[in-house]
Amino acid sequence: MTAWLDFPLALSPLVVVSMKGGSFGQGSEANGSPQLTGLSECGADRIFLQGQAGIPGIPGVPGTNGLPGAKGDLGPQGPPGERGSTGIPGKAGPKGDKGDQGEACSLASCQQQEAGAKDCKELLDRGETLTGWYMIYPTTGRGMRAYCDMETDGGGWLVFQRRLDGSVDFYRDWEAYKKGFGRQVSEFWLGNDKIHLLTSSGIQQLRIDVEDFNNSKTFAK
């Protein structure tokens, strides 16, 4: 009987035993062969023996990083963010061009002006009850447009300053305050010259109305 055995026990936990032209059985300590356990027959001439697991080997060297992937598609647009706080008012724009000269006053129109109301209170007494801009004549022949409040505190108040939303820049020089500036539909300053004309025509009463960001209102006069 010719037989040969291969025991790669030091390299792999799987031991393959091959036989040719004979049979193979369990060895014994008497004949000097180690006792084999876990034998199973597979086929006509091969027996597989499962040995104990070996010691784990040393980890291999890490491989190189792969190339960067392709750029992904843009994601969907996110929801709009919250509105930020109101910024600081910008600087005043350049001075506008001088307007065209008005027409001379005719005799009929001058007489009508002389008969005009001298202030908002007189307009209210004449039956004007809507708040808005009116033409008044504090002195004879000198008219001006003024905003009359016909609702607050009995009505008849002439508004010479109104600030609501910061849409008009109030950081201006003396010349601007002298002539007046702003927008009739929002914020404005009537003008120092016009205020002087109003206050010099008689005794006036001043009323100041204020409102905070919580819509709380108060006044003083």
From Swiss-Prot:
One of its GO terms (biological process) is complement activation, lectin pathway. Residues 111-221 form the Fibrinogen C-terminal domain. Residues 54-104 are annotated as: Disordered. Pfam families: Collagen, Fibrinogen_C. SMART domains: FBG. Residues 50-104 form the Collagen-like domain. One of its GO terms (molecular function) is toxin activity. Expressed by the mandibular venom duct. Residues 1-25 form the signal peptide. It is found in: Secreted. Disulfide bonds join C120-C148. Keywords: Complement system impairing toxin, Disulfide bond, Hemostasis impairing toxin, Secreted, Signal, Toxin. One of its GO terms (cellular component) is extracellular space. InterPro entries: Collagen (IPR008160), Fibrinogen-like_C (IPR036056), Fibrinogen_a/b/g_C_1 (IPR014716), Fibrinogen_a/b/g_C_dom (IPR002181), Fibrinogen_C-term_domain (IPR050373). It comes from the Eukaryota. PROSITE patterns: FIBRINOGEN_C_2. Initiates complement activation and/or interferes in platelet aggregation and/or blood coagulation. Belongs to the ficolin lectin family. Veficolin subfamily. This is Veficolin-1.
